Amino acid sequence: MEILVIGSGGREHALCWALSGSPLCDTLYCAPGNAGVSAVAECVDVGAEDLDGLMVFVAAKKIDFVVVGPEGPLVLGLIDRLNEAGVKCFGPTAAAAQLEGSKSFTKELCAKYDIPTGAYKRFSDVAEATAYINEKGAPIVVKADGLAAGKGVTVAKSIEEAVAAVDDALVSGRFGDAGASIIVEEFLAGEELSVFAICDGENALMLPSAQDHKAVFDGDKGPNTGGMGAYSPAPVMTGVLAATIEEKIVRRTVAAMKAEGTPFTGVLFAGLMITDNGPQLIEFNVRFGDPECQVLMMRLKSDLLSALVAAADQELKDFDLRWDDQTALTVVLAANGYPESYDKGTEICNVDEADAMFNTKVFHAGTARGKTGALQAIGGRVLNITALGESVTDAQKRAYEAVDAVEWADGFCRRDIGWRAVAREQG
């Protein structure tokens, strides 16, 4: 098969790495890809959201199967375009992608189909939102309704912080159209968990759990990011909890989407809070998490391509995947200043040495080759140093040994990825 992966991040490098080993894969392309992806796929100079350019490339290369990594092209309707052209693809239609593209759509679906989530209200008026926040008190959560690259959520510890987040979205227009309306939601206390399922419109194939770290600094301090690290499996996940999540959240959502006439095909990513009242949905995403995808691909022992094709063909019912019992942990190396402004074009050395370390893989995100062939940072999140270990403690130790092998004066990382699980393991 001629395969095209859409995207340029660490998630897409991990997907390309996994897909490249499939016996079904003859040629693998990635649009636009990055410096790391180029080792396993042919990178194509077409942007992930350039739908016209992508359709031209698909036709020219007679692509058999398209895998869409990021949410942007999904919400814009790339899958709809591919379906119209008769090209097999993996991902939800624009209508189904509203699960991520509109938080109010998801909240209304949860209310209608009894999917457990926090109480909320939607606002586009500053005064009304402020009055609601004053009535409810803090802590409270303020979210941009649309896509904001993982940065549109404020967990406000004070009323003042919540009101400032409202002003950011509705007055300052920080998130553009994505923040033209907001969701104000009850604060859920507990432990966060990421759960993934590959869906074919009717069936859901559950994948292992993962836990990510959104805050930029150690100790979960600082603003939220797209994710600074992750590990899988998450020790908080028990057999009983997994069954509850599958029944009350994942399968209930898949059935709800089918009933609404917008069947969901693709990766359903449930961001959950495990509370004293059981699992509660924080948000849905309609694609693999980044960096959670990297730890999942590190543990996958089966053929990913076969599973994605089965989902596209609505044939997931009896499908299964095998996973390594070891723990995978990834540490994100980011450019100094991220998630705010940061320098581009800084040089990174010794990445190949880190990649060659035992049970370690370096997935590239914001990287490119300079004119001399040197590896350069061109994004905020730049490298994902990923390792396997017998425990979270072991995987963490191995990952940070590889992190320390990389020479990049202009980058930083969190030094505590996996801290909850390590604390559990060490009693």
Give the location of each predicted region.
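ATP-binding N-terminal substructure of ATP-dependent carboxylate-amine bond-forming enzymes
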Residues: 1-95
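Active-site nucleotide/adenylate-binding loops and adjacent lid/helix of ATP-dependent enzymes
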Residues: 4-5, 99-181, 235-252
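Solvent-exposed alpha-helices and their adjacent loops that cap or buttress functional pockets
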Residues: 21, 36-38, 90, 112-114, ...
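Generic C-terminus detector
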Residues: 50, 367-372, 376-427
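Short, conserved charged micro-motifs
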Residues: 53, 129, 161-164, 339-342, ...
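Internal nucleotide-binding/catalytic subdomain
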Residues: 156-293
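Active-site "cap" helix and flanking loop/linker of ATP-utilizing ligase/carboxylase catalytic domains
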Residues: 246-268, 285-357, 370
